[in-house]
């Protein structure tokens, strides 16, 4: 009888755990939310209040110049001018390799921050991670042709090439 009770108890514990297993992805990949932008780390990384904690958001589909790179500070200022202190909606798309939330940030007027930074010429459409995004592709093309933002430079160095060079790897555009 004791063995039977013990087996039943173990099975109940396992079932209780499995019954809540569907909650795990929710914890790992948060749902969309609204919060105030409390920090701008660089052109493509923000901190947004999610409840009582600041969550680091990596803007998906774009790549801005690095802090120490040409146009890096201008990209950061553009993101700050557009979003800092504002109540935004974060549309989450999972986590990146640094455990930052990937997402699109919608400004109070409905404007997509990711797209606006590309439109203003402060970043690249990140083809590697958003290969089918024809909106970002078109916005980058328009900014290049208009020679606005970093596109005033006839041959700007992409952030991924800049990062490689900083690590001592060969510089290829």
Q: Predicted segment positions?
A:
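Small beta-barrel nucleic-acid-binding modules, primarily SNase/OB-fold domains
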Residues: 2-173
